[in-house]
Amino acid sequence: MEKHIKKYIHIVSLLALGILFYALNANVPLRNDDLMYSFMYLRECVGNVPHPIDLNAPIDGIGDVFVSQFNHYFSMNGRTPVHFVVQLFCAVFNKDIFNICTSLVYILFLVGVAKLVFPDHRSYVHYVGIASVFWFFFPFSLFYASGISFAVNYMWSLTACIWFLLLYRKARSGLVMGKSGCALALAVSFLAGWSHEAFAMGIAGALFIHTLYDYKKNENGGQKFYLAVAFCLGAAMLVISPGTLGRLHSVGAVVDIVDAVYSRIGVLFFMKRLWLLLGLTFFLTVAGCLNIASFLKENTFLLMALCIEILFILLLGFVNERALLGVEFFSFLLLLRMLCKWKKAKYLLNKYILISFFSIFLCMELNVIKVLSLTEKEYFSIIDSYLADANGFAYQANLDIPFYYNRYISRLSPDSWEVKALSYYYGKPMHLFPASYKEYLLHIDSYLSPAYQVENEGGLYKIPETSLYIAQVDSCHEEDTFVCTFSYEPVPVKEKYSLRQVWDRSVYENKYDRYEIKVSPVRWNDRSVVIIDNAAFENRVLQNIVMKAD
């Protein structure tokens, strides 16, 4: 009877966590790349659209998704199963169905991590503890209110890889599955390998080394071998994709030797969980609290996967923090497994401490859900204003959101990729400004006078008390794109590097002290003007702005 009660408590606790996760995602509309996945993908880009999509061909059924993903494999990257699911929910099904499915995947994620960290015994406390720990200490909000594309690419892919690790562990322990179970396990292994390179590359490399070791000991063969082969075949499908190879070539292209070396050294400083793992390992080993030989033996596979992921990142250099998710996850997983081996950690893993920790997590998550409902209303209000305005102008009020919620909440910003995505999705250029700029922008004509002209810049005017610049370009057409080049006084290399990482895709670095941002002119009272918001650069000394046709 007691055993059944514990089982029901496990189920109820997991369902409660799943419902909380559902509430988070229920307040997130289609965002960012989700909008692009509503259209058919092509083999190459058309016009100025950064994604190779046909804006005149929205997805009209599952058959279109197959064709679109076939093209996507050649033009974008090799994550075909992942993006098939993304496009299915973005274009064929709807966000409500996705919210239910992703909540179930989140439950599988929690169960999978619990099985890896606590292989022998698990209670409801472990599930709520893992949910709380990942909420506070894992660096990526991609697991939470992140939209369809990010959630499937990262959380779903990671969950598939976690369950593959559990299957592989069972196969290595000698468990023999029946034919139907083996067929299902092979399918899961293949799809997990064909999910996301941030996880699959490390696991595939560790599987290869494990298989060679088994071959040397004449222990190769059996179901563990077939699972490893299936996973590696899936990972190979990721790597050999023409889209992936093209992206790797563009990322790995050496523009400047100093920048190439710095990006590979600098990436190490972003691996915070790795340094925490190394530091704690050293401390516990020196203090005699950890049997390092036993720990290394028990976690050989995970350590190999971690090392291969680090090597993979060092070869590529820093791309973005999302690329580090595999390194951070394996480091964090090993850290949790180490704490479980440390006898004194039982005080940290005490049931009452974990429940108290969960209470803080619950209060914070409920507040985030409340704020997300406000940002969702704001999002649709901005869309309505933008569509109703003849010039595509929209204004965003300043919401008083605590800074510690920023990692869980994504809002529109004037220079974000999402503004461009909305422009493509609705077929109308979007121009988003702070609400305080509205009165200025309604009277643009009054600022196109010599009194507001920027010195030494004949066609450039500045609106006082704002970071807005206006350039009149009567000879251009609305579909033209101009590039504004901002020149700054030299800044330290470290600062330049950090700046380069936080700007979105519309901003490009040119020889360390010059930055370019692409803008499109808008029609205003029968003339074309370019409106430049210099807010992103307000902490720098602006020397000049050069307009040139792109």
Where are the language model's segments positioned?
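Alpha-helical transmembrane segments
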Residues: K7-F21, Y127-S132, L186-A187, A228-L233
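Signature aromatic-anchored transmembrane alpha helix within multi-pass, membrane-resident enzymes
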Residues: K179-C182, L303, K341-E365
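Membrane-interface transmembrane helices that cradle and orient dolichyl/undecaprenyl
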Residues: C161-C182, K216-E219
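Transmembrane catalytic cores of multi-pass membrane glycosyltransferases
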Residues: Y22-I97, I148-V152, S189-C307, L314-A323
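Membrane-interface micro-motifs in multi-pass membrane enzymes
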Residues: R79, H126-R169, H196, M271-G279, ...
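Transmembrane alpha-helices and membrane-interface helical segments
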Residues: L108-K115, W163-K170, A206-D214, T281-N291, ...
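Intrinsically disordered, polar/acidic, low-complexity terminal segments
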Residues: K6-P81, C90-F109, H121-R122, C363-D550
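Membrane-interfacial loop-to-transmembrane alpha-helix junctions, especially the N-terminal start
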Residues: Y8-H10, H121-G129, M177-C182, N220-A228, ...
